[in-house]
From Swiss-Prot:
Residues annotated for DNA binding in this entry: 91, 110
Record keywords: DNA damage, DNA repair, DNA-binding, Glycosidase, Hydrolase, Lyase, Metal-binding, Multifunctional enzyme, Zinc, Zinc-finger
Domain of life: Bacteria
Any one Gene Ontology molecular-function term assigned to this protein's record: zinc ion binding
Coiled-coil residue spans: none
NCBIfam families: fpg, PRK01103.1
Record EC number: 3.2.2.23, 4.2.99.18
Zinc finger annotations (FPG-type) as residue ranges: 238-272
UniProt-recorded name of the protein: Formamidopyrimidine-DNA glycosylase
SUPFAM superfamilies (alphabetical): Glucocorticoid receptor-like (DNA-binding domain) (SSF57716), N-terminal domain of MutM-like DNA repair proteins (SSF81624), S13-like H2TH domain (SSF46946)
Substrates-to-products reaction catalysed: Hydrolysis of DNA containing ring-opened 7-methylguanine residues, releasing 2,6-diamino-4-hydroxy-5-(N-methyl)formamidopyrimidine; 2'-deoxyribonucleotide-(2'-deoxyribose 5'-phosphate)-2'-deoxyribonucleotide-DNA = a 3'-end 2'-deoxyribonucleotide-(2,3-dehydro-2,3-deoxyribose 5'-phosphate)-DNA + a 5'-end 5'-phospho-2'-deoxyribonucleoside-DNA + H(+)
Signal peptide bounds: none
């Protein structure tokens, strides 16, 4: 958490709140969050104007013209905008003071979030180095490529979907939902999937992540959008967090198990494990 739908919702909120604003000062309380040169980060950001707010997978891209501030929220990161005085909070770690008098604050209970300030010309190389897969859209997420990679891999399907190389943006919540919708057991070896299963995984990834965006993300644990509001996708989750409840498709009780060290929710009847 947050996954692609939540990050996209944050992106839209940031765009509505800070587009066109000039950064006049930056205060950084947790230096380890910045993965590029600290001095450059502190000295370069003041005077920059936020020209657009984009997203690639789970990364937010704050476009400053020739530079891009790449923000990864990791487990608990979120942005808040205060029009005047900023309240004390030990979890507020980065403060972007804006020319209109407001302050954009990055909050992160776990302190896992990261910032990279890079030249826009280096953005493609930045993501290539991380082997980030395509966006989950029909135009970019090609079935034939997805199929070829899966059938040549010995990885288990759930960890494979989570590693961001097949497709960008899936996390634990949405992988469980995709696997249930596609009727695939999470411990199935990628290479043992048949073509019909692969097509279902492909199509359901696109559909479910789009639904997550439409519903403003899933509010489980601490997620809120930039405007402080909850998402509603949690009301549409079929298996994640539904342990003991009847499967919406067949009525069998949803069970929780561990796959690749991650809590995983499945229907044991709809998602049969291969012998």
């Amino acid at each position: 958490m947050p996954e692609l739908p939540e990050v996209e919702t944050v992106r839209r909120g940031l765009k509505a709140l800070v587009l066109g604003q000039e950064i006049v000062a930056v205060t950084l309380k947790v230096p380890k969050m910045v993965k590029t040169d600290l001095e450059t980060f502190a000295l370069t950001l003041p005077g920059q104007i936020i020209q657009s707010v984009g997203r690639r997978g789970k990364y937010l891209l704050i476009d400053l013209g020739q530079l891009v501030l790449v923000s990864h929220l990791r487990m608990e990161g979120k942005y808040l905008l205060f029009p005047d005085e900023v309240p004390d909070n030990k979890h507020f770690h980065v403060f972007f003071e804006l020319k209109n008098g407001s302050t954009l604050v990055y909050q992160d209970v776990r302190k896992f979030g990261t910032f990279d300030l890079i030249a826009k010309s280096q953005l493609s190389a930045f993501f290539a180095k991380r082997k980030l897969g395509p966006e989950p859209k029909k135009e970019t997420f090609k079935l034939k490529t997805f199929e070829a990679v899966l059938l040549s891999s010995k990885k288990t399907i759930k960890p494979h979907l989570l590693d961001q190389t097949l497709v960008a943006g899936l996390g634990n919540i949405y992988v469980d939902e995709v696997l249930w919708a596609a009727k695939v057991h999470p411990e199935t070896a990628s290479s043992r999937l048949n073509k019909a299963e692969i097509k279902r995984l492909h199509d359901e990834t696109i559909r479910i992540l789009a639904l997550g965006i439409e519903k403003g993300g899933s509010t489980v644990r601490t997620y809120r959008n930039t405007l402080g509001a909850d998402g509603t996708m949690q009301d549409y989750l079929q298996v994640y967090g539904q342990t003991g409840k009847p499967c919406p498709r067949c009525g069998q009780a949803i069970v929780k198990l561990k796959v690749g060290g991650r809590g995983t929710h499945i229907c044991p009847k709809c998602q049969k494990k291969r012998p």
